[in-house]
Amino acid sequence: MTPAELRALRERLGLSQGELAKRLGIDRNTVWRKEHGQRAITERDCIMLRQIERDGAS
């Protein structure tokens, strides 16, 4: 997953960076860094994002 894909997914789910961070168990600043290519998007992130997407943002 690319930084742009991460941001697009977050926005499609209607989540703020803070809300996504909470669901991923990371800091909001880390989400920002991942969306801007300053931190790697890990396999763990991808697995959790697929679960969030499957379950919906509610």
Where are these regions (language model features)?
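A short, Lys/Arg-rich alpha-helix, primarily the initiator
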Residues: 1-12
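Residue-level detection of the helix-turn-helix DNA-binding "recognition helix"
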Residues: 11, 25, 36-38
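DNA major-groove recognition helix of helix-turn-helix
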Residues: 24, 34-35, 45, 53
